[in-house]
Amino acid sequence: MCGIVGYTGNHQAAPVLLYGLSKLEYRGYDSAGLAVRDGDGETDIIKAKGRLKVLADKTNDGESVPGTCGIGHTRWATHGEPSELNAHPHMSDDGNVVAVHNGIIENYQELKEKLIRKGYTFYSSTDTEVAVKLVDYYYKKYLGTPVDAINHAMVRIRGSYALAIMFKDYPGEIYVARKDSPMILGVEDGESYIASDVPAILKYTRNVYYIGNLEMARVRKGEITFYNLDGDEIQKEAKTIEWDAEAAEKAGFEHFMIKEIHEQPKAVKDTLNSVIREGVIDLSDVGLTDEDIRDISQIYIVACGSAYHVGMAAQYVFEDLARIPVRVELASEFRYRNPILDPKGLVIIVSQSGETADSLAALRESKEKGLRTLGIVNVVGSSIAREADNVFYTLAGPEISVATTKAYSTQLVAAYVLAIQFAKVKGTISEEKYEELIIELQTLPDKIRKIIEDDKERIQWFAAKQANARDAFFIGRGIDYAISMEGSLKMKEVSYVHTEAYAAGELKHGTISLIEDGTLVIGVLTQDHLYEKTVSNLVECKSRGAYLMGLTTFGHYNIEDTADFTVYIPKTDPHFTTSLAVVPLQLLGYYVSVAKGLDVDKPRNLAKSVTVE
């Protein structure tokens, strides 16, 4: 992994490829490369270790590389260390086949040994070079078309891949193959584009095709032909991307992360407006009927990272409002433990990209076991969106920063909407309560906006004071524990401070031994019935020298007797406090990172969309 672009048309390819790769930088990478052909000429391959600027400088921003057909790649090392040698593209021994690849080929070692016996030489430590030479082997063995050769290779590769391949015998053409790794293709005015994600080609076209699992495509100027695994042509309809290209730009903000924090009120409002019409929840676009809901006796929420924290908060809301049992599962664990599942259960898969490898695998496992599946995703046409029985689209728009903010917030309100509708249909709340909850939901965007406007500068000041913190502990009870988990992750991933989140009641069972003079402890106290208990936990920490931050609702002013710094959030229904309390914690993580001079939008070792296991 991590990012692929491709172009064939009438313009110089290299500048288009570099621009596309720049729009995929948020996915994380350690090296980059281009392969460009000028008509029937040889392929120019240029690679560079480090930032994309190194590659741009090598190629004079692409202007020194002739040719109108090419592929590009940003690599994040999975097989072989970060180096120019291991960077993509890779080519066959005679240069006939050149390719870039995202994913992991699990049986690359046995394939490599087979190819060595056939006379192939390997120069890198990557699994991608194996894929390139496997395609070349079958191309020469059967003397068929590129589609034939790729087909033979696909059935022998185990693992995940998105491949973009050029053949010397077919100038001006790019061939694409996909299994469990995202890829989109676009067409506009006699030109064609390929990319791992929409922002890379949004400047050039809004007309895109989604290539399915175990499918191939032949990409020519302004023309794309799709094939199934048997090599038969298949028909697809283009989809129109509704995103505004400017939505993927910083719009005057210093970083995407702070821009996306500010975009949360609109993202939440848009998501709510998509399913609340005239004061009533309408799930017709989701495809979930009242009859479907009555049939469901158990909910499983399966996700990774921040989406898992959404599930943790949603568990409390579903169980308390709808009185339906909920289990929250890490997708990376779910598929490997042969879980016992209620056949009348609903599996909710939460994923911003809709391509998260472990979540996608959990979805498929659930479907194989006969359970109904529902995806909460942000990307229209993504794998999870296509394969789930029902889809709840969040309307966050493009989220560029690796650390999620607005997508997380829209996932939360999607979960609230589902929980409220389940409660209504199952008769566990009154009509009056149903109406109250919907009214309160619709106040969240303005309350989020108020927090950002009122507390941003104070939190920035506090973050600057804590920039040298070695450790930070986030504690809370109930929903506040779920909020603490997300706050901890935010600070950890963007500021590189070692942070942990704990259920406050667990402090006595070992963790309190880590508290010493000056240790930063953040207490989340938004639940009135748990407030006093969490305050007592903070007092215990303070007595051991901790420096305390309290995050609570307006009215709990006695927290200032204990905490050294306090942030208040507006009152809301206790089921919805996550949506408000998470915002100061997002700002805290952001401003600590800024104070340390770090790359906020592209934290080290992280990728936006984890498309391999």
Regions found by a protein language model. Name each.
Residues 68, 72-85, 275-290, 314-350, ...:
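Glycine-rich oxoanion-binding loops at beta->alpha junctions
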Residues 231, 547, 560-562, 572-613:
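Generic C-terminus detector
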Residues 294-436, 440-443, 524-568, 588, ...:
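Glycine-rich phosphate-binding loops that contact phosphosugars or nucleotide phosphates
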Residues 157-191, 467-493, 528, 535:
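Acidic/histidine-rich
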Residues 1-254, 266-297, 336, 431, ...:
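Conserved short alpha-helical segments that host acidic/polar catalytic motifs at enzyme active sites
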Residues 264-268, 272-300, 390-520, 593-613:
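Active-site phosphate/pyrophosphate-binding segments
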